[in-house]
């Protein structure tokens, strides 16, 4: 073997050894770096999973929010529909006969110039009628009384309350023409006495007629405040009928009287009506002993009161047969 060949072989071996050394170094580095790389890759994978879960959670939250919004909108629409159904006025039993008029034949139509004309039901429905009673004060009477009250110094803004309190006073004290009123309503009447107010009333009407006009109002007042007439027990009324123990009870349901805005709290019971009529009969009989005298001169009366009207209440018996 020549020297050149030997030299070439030595170079090749040196190159191979150098290559082997480099590969060994590379493998050593690779072996040293492998755990760190794996850890990084693992972390990257976990981060990717977390990001994916976050995106999924966000997507679900968005879908849930959209669903909630949709349900809320539907709920609001449903609530609005129900609110629209809540109306105060509902027509019931709609038999609206007054909407149409019968097509009467000409020969049946009433001749309004003839006093003997026969009205139809429609004609009667068209007639406007205001309830009136000659047993209570009229609007003309009340206009005069109101003017008198104001001229005495009763504040204008208190006129209605003054009349309410005055008629309520008469519930306990009486509405008789012989009533001797005491006291005054200082806060309402501006210092005007009850006696002066009642005197003004008597110029034009009677106290009882005025009290009848306000009977429904004092009735409601007593019921809503649970304050019956003060003398109910002394008049012989029972616990069940005590609210009927006043003079003008029989005008509580009179449509010509001034009505409370909401109407009567309740109507009088049969027991209350019977009790009031009974007491009225007793009171009239007690005061009727002198009614048969045509003249009250002593020559006629002999200086004595008349005989008491005899009413045999205790002999009234029920027929049990």
Curated annotation (Swiss-Prot):
Recorded superkingdom: Viruses
Signal peptide (residue range): none
Predominant location category: virion
Any one GO molecular-function label of the UniProt entry: structural molecule activity
Assigned keywords, A-Z: Capsid protein, Helical capsid protein, Ribonucleoprotein, Virion
Bias (Basic and acidic residues) ranges: 9-39
Pfam families xrefs: Flexi_CP, Flexi_CP_N
Glycosyltransferase among keywords: no
Region (Disordered): 1-43
GO cellular component, one term: ribonucleoprotein complex
Subcellular location, record wording: Virion
Family of the protein in this entry: Belongs to the potexviruses coat protein family.
Function: Required for genome encapsidation. Forms ribonucleoprotein complexes along with TGB1 helicase and viral RNA.
Protein name (record): Capsid protein
């Amino acid at each position: 073997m020549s020297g050149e060949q030997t030299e070439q072989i030595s170079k090749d071996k040196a190159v191979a050894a150098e290559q082997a050394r480099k590969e060994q170094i590379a493998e050593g580095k690779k072996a040293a770096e492998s755990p760190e790389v794996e850890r990084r890759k693992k972390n990257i994978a976990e981060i990717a999973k977390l990001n994916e879960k976050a995106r999924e959670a966000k997507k679900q939250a968005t879908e849930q929010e959209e669903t909630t919004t949709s349900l809320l909108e539907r709920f609001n629409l449903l609530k609005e529909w129900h609110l629209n159904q809540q109306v105060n006025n509902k027509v019931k039993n709609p038999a609206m006969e007054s909407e149409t008029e019968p097509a009467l034949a000409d020969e049946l139509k009433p001749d309004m110039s003839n006093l003997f004309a026969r009205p139809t039901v429609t004609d009667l429905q068209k007639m406007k009628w205001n309830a009136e009673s000659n047993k209570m004060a009229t609007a003309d009477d009340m206009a005069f009384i109101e003017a008198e009250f104001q001229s005495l110094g009763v504040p204008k803004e208190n006129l209605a309350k003054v009349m309410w309190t005055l008629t309520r006073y008469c519930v306990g004290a009486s509405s008789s023409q012989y009533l001797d009123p005491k006291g005054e309503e200082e806060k309402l009447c501006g210092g005007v006495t009850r006696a002066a107010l009642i005197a003004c009333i008597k110029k034009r009407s009677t106290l009882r007629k005025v009290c009848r006009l306000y009977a429904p109002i004092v009735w409601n007042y007593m019921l809503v405040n649970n304050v019956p007439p003060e003398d109910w027990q002394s008049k012989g009324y029972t616990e069940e009928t005590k609210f009927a123990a006043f003079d003008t009870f029989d005008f509580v349901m009179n449509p010509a009287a001034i009505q409370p805005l909401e109407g009567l709290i309740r109507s009088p019971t049969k027991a209350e009506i019977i009790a009031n009529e009974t007491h009225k009969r007793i009171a009239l009989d007690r005061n009727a002993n002198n009614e048969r005298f045509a003249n009250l001169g002593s020559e006629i009366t002999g200086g004595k009161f008349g005989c008491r009207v005899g009413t045999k209440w205790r002999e009234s018996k029920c027929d049990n047969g």
